[in-house]
Amino acid sequence: MRQVIIARKDLNMSPGKLAAQCCHASLAFLTSQMRDRSQMSKLYRDGEVVAYNPFGMIIEKDIYEEWISGIFTKTICEARNRNQLMKAVSIAQGLGLKEGIDFFLIKDSCLTELEPEEVDENGVGRTLTCIGFKPLPDDIAHQISKKFQLYK
C-alpha cells in the first residue's frame, strides 16, 4: 500500500513550496473527513463551542492496518504541466476512483510565489499544483504512477 502524489514541474516551485504542496496532498484524504463538522463531537464551555473532536473518522481497514499503522509509503511523481496532471485524473476515474474521496486536487491560494491560473467562486486566485491520492494497494498505485516519472 502506498500513497501517490503527483506535482507539477512547470511551476518551478521552490523546495519549500513543493514540500508544502505535497504535504497538503498527503493529508487531504484525512483533512477532508476532519472538515466535516456534522461528524464531529464538540466540547462546550459556558454554552460556547471551544473545541472540536474530528477523530470519529472512518478509515478503511486496509489503509489503517497497512499504511497508518505501517510505514506511510509515498511515491512522489512529476507532471510536466497542468495537462499531464489532469491525465492522472482521467486514469484515476478510469479505475473507478472519485475526486474528493480517493484523490484530491490541490490548488494553491497564490499568496507567495505562484501566479493564479484561475479565480474561484470567492474571487481567490488559485493554481493547481498537485494531486494526492489516498493510500492505495500497490497494483492500483502503480497503474497511476507508471505514466509519470519520479520527481527530480
What are the residue ranges of the model-derived segments?
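Positively charged, small/polar-rich N-terminal and surface patches that mediate targeting and assembly
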Residues: 1-152
